[in-house]
Amino acid sequence: MRSIFWDDGLKLIDQTKLPEKLEVIECRNVEELADAIKKLAVRGAPALEAAGAYGIALAAREREFADVDELKEHLKKAADFLASTRPTAVNLFVGIERALNAALKGESVEEVKELALREAEKLAEEDVERNRKMGEYGAELLEDGDVVLTYCNAGRLATVDWGTALGVVRSAVEQGKEIRVIACETRPLNQGSRLTCWELMEDGIDVTLITDSMVGIVMQKGMVDKVIVGADRIVRDAVFNKIGTYTVSVVAKHHNIPFYVAAPKATFDWERTAKDVVIEERPREELIFCGKRQIAPLNVKVYNPAFDPTPLENVTALITEYGVIYPPYEVNVPKVLKF
């Protein structure tokens, strides 16, 4: 099952319910989709790209419009509203812009609706194809018997299907290689323990769960061969990914363990540097409560950024649908991705 899809309406796996329950929910309007994005029912940069595109298609169908001009104005407002939900993941903006630009070419209400949905469906198919290509290129970096440490969730739940970092693992396993995975729990929302472990176990891939603070000891003991993570935005000097990724990269570099980032071209924002990126800050309750249980004083000060920048100097290579890119990135990224 895809993480997000159109079936007479916008459907998505509610990732807040996993691993206890696999539940598909329907977003009936843009407000419901925005809420799903904010509460992380749908998350992961490529999945958000699809959500942004499908959001424009949804906006075109959520009510009746007097004429095509009224519909187009509504779509522009919906685009701005959806873009405001999460400021760091650039893919969301890419998906919104693609579907909006396609829709605005329509000359009638029905044509606008059709063009928006067609572009969203096209984008979703492209995501699956590029993840497969990424997986094939990345699998060449893995040896039979490798243990891969990953952080957060960059699997099929974070994409339309197959995954980026976990797509590399899946492709290697599909080739007949024996690959084991160490998954970091990824505090505070535990995407690693809840989502990565769940989907790898569903696929029968060997996975061991550790706390984030155990990264050092598993590397020190020689239990990790490679690190592969995903990305929410890649700029000229850094990779923005789930908070804690930077720490993993530092420890991996200290132990001379290859640190790979798997991400599609749409995740690259090559005109910007780390200082230009707004890092989303999540609600303080995410640290004070674990589920419904209080685990910290209610009035404690909280700092809860969702992402951190990993300097590109810590990254061994970037795995993309166009191939594996090695340093110097300032030369090779534009060359390979044709920026």
Swiss-Prot record:
<dbReference type="InterPro" id="IPR037171">
    <property type="entry name" value="NagB/RpiA_transferase-like"/>
</dbReference>
<feature type="binding site">
    <location>
        <begin position="43"/>
        <end position="45"/>
    </location>
    <ligand>
        <name>substrate</name>
    </ligand>
</feature>
<comment type="function">
    <text>Catalyzes the interconversion of methylthioribose-1-phosphate (MTR-1-P) into methylthioribulose-1-phosphate (MTRu-1-P).</text>
</comment>
<feature type="binding site">
    <location>
        <position position="191"/>
    </location>
    <ligand>
        <name>substrate</name>
    </ligand>
</feature>
<keyword id="KW-0413">Isomerase</keyword>
<keyword id="KW-0028">Amino-acid biosynthesis</keyword>
<protein>
    <recommendedName>
        <fullName>Putative methylthioribose-1-phosphate isomerase</fullName>
        <ecNumber>5.3.1.23</ecNumber>
    </recommendedName>
</protein>
<dbReference type="InterPro" id="IPR011559">
    <property type="entry name" value="Initiation_fac_2B_a/b/d"/>
</dbReference>
<dbReference type="InterPro" id="IPR027363">
    <property type="entry name" value="M1Pi_N"/>
</dbReference>
<feature type="site" description="Transition state stabilizer">
    <location>
        <position position="152"/>
    </location>
</feature>
<dbReference type="GO" id="GO:0046523">
    <property type="term" value="F:S-methyl-5-thioribose-1-phosphate isomerase activity"/>
</dbReference>
<feature type="binding site">
    <location>
        <begin position="241"/>
        <end position="242"/>
    </location>
    <ligand>
        <name>substrate</name>
    </ligand>
</feature>
<dbReference type="InterPro" id="IPR005251">
    <property type="entry name" value="IF-M1Pi"/>
</dbReference>
<keyword id="KW-0486">Methionine biosynthesis</keyword>
<dbReference type="GO" id="GO:0019509">
    <property type="term" value="P:L-methionine salvage from methylthioadenosine"/>
</dbReference>
<dbReference type="InterPro" id="IPR000649">
    <property type="entry name" value="IF-2B-related"/>
</dbReference>
<comment type="similarity">
    <text>Belongs to the eIF-2B alpha/beta/delta subunits family. MtnA subfamily.</text>
</comment>
<dbReference type="Pfam" id="PF01008">
    <property type="entry name" value="IF-2B"/>
</dbReference>
<dbReference type="InterPro" id="IPR042529">
    <property type="entry name" value="IF_2B-like_C"/>
</dbReference>
<feature type="active site" description="Proton donor">
    <location>
        <position position="232"/>
    </location>
</feature>
<feature type="binding site">
    <location>
        <position position="86"/>
    </location>
    <ligand>
        <name>substrate</name>
    </ligand>
</feature>
